[in-house]
Amino acid sequence: MNKPVLVVMAAGMGSRYGGMKQIDPVGPNGQVIMDYSLYDARRAGFETVIFVIKHEIEDAFKAAIGDRVSKAMNVKYAFQQLEELPAGFAVPEGRVKPWGTCHAVLAAKPLIDGPFAVINADDYYGPEAFQVMYDYLSTHAGDDFYRYCMVSYLLKNTLSENGSVARGVCIKNEDGTLQSVTERTRIEPCGGGAHYTEDGGESWVDLPGDTPVSMNLWGFGKSFLDEAEQRFAGWLTENLPVNPLKCEYFLPLVVTELIEENKAKIQVLRSTDKWFGVTYREDKPLVVDAIAHKTAEGQYPEKLWE
């Protein structure tokens, strides 16, 4: 069994935040959020990282993080490109938005030869998540089912004080596997928990603070890439006529189909760490403070890669 590798999705445009937030410093020596994720991943056992980026940001990305991390990890690059579509499909006129998280992972397919974990570039996941993920991927191969996993967080540990967030709300089976994950695109804090709306704020549905949610930290086998690739053309046929400029091929979509078809079992691993991220510019000072606190406590050195 090959060692698990880490895939970092960094091609998104950071639309809500305005700017290339993946390389916006938050640490005491100019570190970005991704530095801390990669440092935690390396400590957990991951030795290879594949960055999925856009060609346009390649030089800036390497200067900001890739070259630095390459001192400690084997660094590879994959490029998510709009025109990378199945035969018979073309990019709709006016489309600039990337094709989503599943398309991002497919960009890395030629570089993946075993189990892999997927993370967002701009989320702080904490050390526990990478450890449980690495341990699972290192010890679980497929059998009668594809054996995948995800790390869930408590919803209350993933909210922003500065606006709504999108989260994958999870329901678990009795055996701890994932029954379903539903993307809620507008969740806001409310009392001790949260609530979400699907109709622009006309009505709200309460969610308890301890609801398990996905932060796009998934663990897959190589089989997932074949499944995602085979389903892409069908997804395009269905979605392009409806929403040509904004539709996105998301990881949970394929995960849900594989669960419904009884092909995959996705173990829900837990992290009690608090998530940090810069969804809005106003979030940044909170992240800077949190990192400073963790550094002062000795969880991270002042200089990560030296």
Kindly label every feature range from the protein language model.
Residues 283-306:
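Generic C-terminus detector
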Residues 127-217:
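Conserved core of the sugar-phosphate nucleotidyltransferase
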Residues 228-264:
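A C-terminal functional module that forms or caps the active site or interfaces directly
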Residues 114-124:
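Short beta-strand-to-loop acidic/aromatic patch adjacent to the donor-nucleotide binding site
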Residues 217-229:
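Conserved nucleotide-sugar donor-binding
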Residues 87-98, 163-168, 282-286:
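Short, surface-exposed amphipathic charged segments that create phosphate/polyanion-binding patches used
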Residues 2-66, 75, 80, 114:
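N-terminal glycine-rich phosphate-binding loop and ensuing alpha1 helix
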Residues 69-114:
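Short phosphate-binding loop-to-helix
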